[in-house]
Amino acid sequence: MSIIVNVDVMLAKRKMTSGELAEKVGITAANLSILKTGKARAIRFTTLDALCKALDCQPGDILEYRD
């Protein structure tokens, strides 16, 4: 079981940089990098909400479950 984080896909679709996203969401570039590489062990709902608002997407566009 694994959760795949597709933030890079959404960044490309929105033509946005990681730095721009981190600033809009209110997290550090380092924390965004940890999330993007799948090394994060958890994500707060408030952070997920901010990501979805900044990227104009749904949680399922960012997170994917693979068995």
What are these regions (language model features)?
Residues 1-16:
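A short, Lys/Arg-rich alpha-helix, primarily the initiator
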Residues 8, 19, 49:
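Residues within the helices of the helix-turn-helix
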Residues 9, 29, 34, 41, ...:
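Short, charged recognition helix plus adjacent turn
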Residues 16-34:
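Short alpha-helical DNA-recognition segment
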Residues 46-61:
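DNA major-groove recognition helix of helix-turn-helix/homeodomain DNA-binding modules
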